[in-house]
Amino acid sequence: MRECISIHVGQAGVQIGNACWELYCLEHGIQPDGQMPSDKTIGGGDDSFNTFFSETGAGKHVPRAVFVDLEPTVIDEVRTGTYRQLFHPEQLITGKEDAANNYARGHYTIGKEIIDLVLDRIRKLADQCTGLQGFLVFHSFGGGTGSGFTSLLMERLSVDYGKKSKLEFSIYPAPQVSTAVVEPYNSILTTHTTLEHSDCAFMVDNEAIYDICRRNLDIERPTYTNLNRLISQIVSSITASLRFDGALNVDLTEFQTNLVPYPRIHFPLATYAPVISAEKAYHEQLSVSEITNACFEPANQMVKCDPRHGKYMACCLLYRGDVVPKDVNAAIATIKTKRSIQFVDWCPTGFKVGINYQPPTVVPGGDLAKVQRAVCMLSNTTAIAEAWARLDHKFDLMYAKRAFVHWYVGEGMEEGEFSEAREDMAALEKDYEEVGVDSVEGEGEEEGEEY
């Protein structure tokens, strides 16, 4: 069995975790108390959903997940919420004082007091797995726990589980819903530390999600619940192939194989369609070609950047619902002729396609309409470097004045770590630039013959 363990760190990670597990339970027909009426094999079995849920002898399904936060209030909501019976109390780990939006507190001072307990709980979950394939880590870049503690955890996971894949779902800070002035510092410090430990990181830009909620779902003032429900749909689409019998991307390593050309270039761009409110869904026919086209609209991306200015290195289309290969092939053929999709010249312009026949599920009372089919596109494009450039610029503005740095130094960091992290980010931007540059040999002859 190829199990995945989800680790939800900090407030953002935990709240996205809530949305995701709520959706998984609906998709698999698991009740809030963990019972699953449709499951015939009690106490185990080799069903696909067992990658995410373990079964007890009493027929209860328990998420293979750990929730960690350095302060208790957010996880207390899980402990008292609808799904309180779903989780084992030991899976919900809280500290006493928070990281106060300070990477150094999350990584050094406060984080180190709780890390061993967390690793111990992860070890217990890992022991229940017959063939653990890896970890999904959910966190934000901006918070102290999300940035500092995650990077500490990733370092330790690399030591304890060297060969296992680690995928991240990271929330990229947005100006609209900013919670701290020091988000650029935390983001760059955490990216620098986790870069070599993470195999694949799906970034989600709060601003992009915010705009999608406003534009496509007509929510004037989106709340975190709106954002998280949308994010959970995307996470669910990406992990559907792991939880249902799918044909493509059946395990985590396959994501890397398909999307990561070089170890550092591991930030695929996710795009999801259709995002549509129930009122509108009645009047629109969302065919395979329409939703496929929508994936190439920058407006539907999870990170604000423009792929038309970048080049693609890889492209995966994950369909779910009522989709047949014939329609998909037609849709892709149309896109190849119409769209100005530029692949790097050292990479074949193939689209990898996965179809999962389980239609998308929606949370009752949520914002999204129930649709027959949906698609999630994962593409590795050089355009995502724009996101790093924006962040680096904000970092530079503050760091030039050494603003707020004393809070980090006071928690035992050294100023050198800032410049080291910033240099690493500059190198990352450079890497993206170089990947997009055409290789030298075949220059003259094949310029006009890309497509």
UniProtKB/Swiss-Prot annotation:
A motif (MREC motif) lies at residues 1-4. GTP binds at Q11, E71, S140, G144, T145, T179, N206, N228. Its cofactor is Mg(2+). Some glutamate residues at the C-terminus are polyglycylated, resulting in polyglycine chains on the gamma-carboxyl group. Glycylation is mainly limited to tubulin incorporated into axonemes (cilia and flagella) whereas glutamylation is prevalent in neuronal cells, centrioles, axonemes, and the mitotic spindle. Both modifications can coexist on the same protein on adjacent residues, and lowering polyglycylation levels increases polyglutamylation, and reciprocally. The precise function of polyglycylation is still unclear. Some glutamate residues at the C-terminus are polyglutamylated, resulting in polyglutamate chains on the gamma-carboxyl group. Polyglutamylation plays a key role in microtubule severing by spastin (SPAST). SPAST preferentially recognizes and acts on microtubules decorated with short polyglutamate tails: severing activity by SPAST increases as the number of glutamates per tubulin rises from one to eight, but decreases beyond this glutamylation threshold. The active site is at E254. InterPro entries: Alpha_tubulin, Tub_FtsZ_C, Tubulin, Tubulin/FtsZ-like_C, Tubulin/FtsZ_2-layer-sand-dom, Tubulin/FtsZ_GTPase_sf, Tubulin_C, Tubulin_CS. PROSITE patterns: TUBULIN (PS00227). Transmembrane segments: none annotated. Dimer of alpha and beta chains. A typical microtubule is a hollow water-filled tube with an outer diameter of 25 nm and an inner diameter of 15 nM. Alpha-beta heterodimers associate head-to-tail to form protofilaments running lengthwise along the microtubule wall with the beta-tubulin subunit facing the microtubule plus end conferring a structural polarity. Microtubules usually have 13 protofilaments but different protofilament numbers can be found in some organisms and specialized cells. Tubulin is the major constituent of microtubules, a cylinder consisting of laterally associated linear protofilaments composed of alpha- and beta-tubulin heterodimers. Microtubules grow by the addition of GTP-tubulin dimers to the microtubule end, where a stabilizing cap forms. Below the cap, tubulin dimers are in GDP-bound state, owing to GTPase activity of alpha-tubulin. This is Tubulin alpha chain.
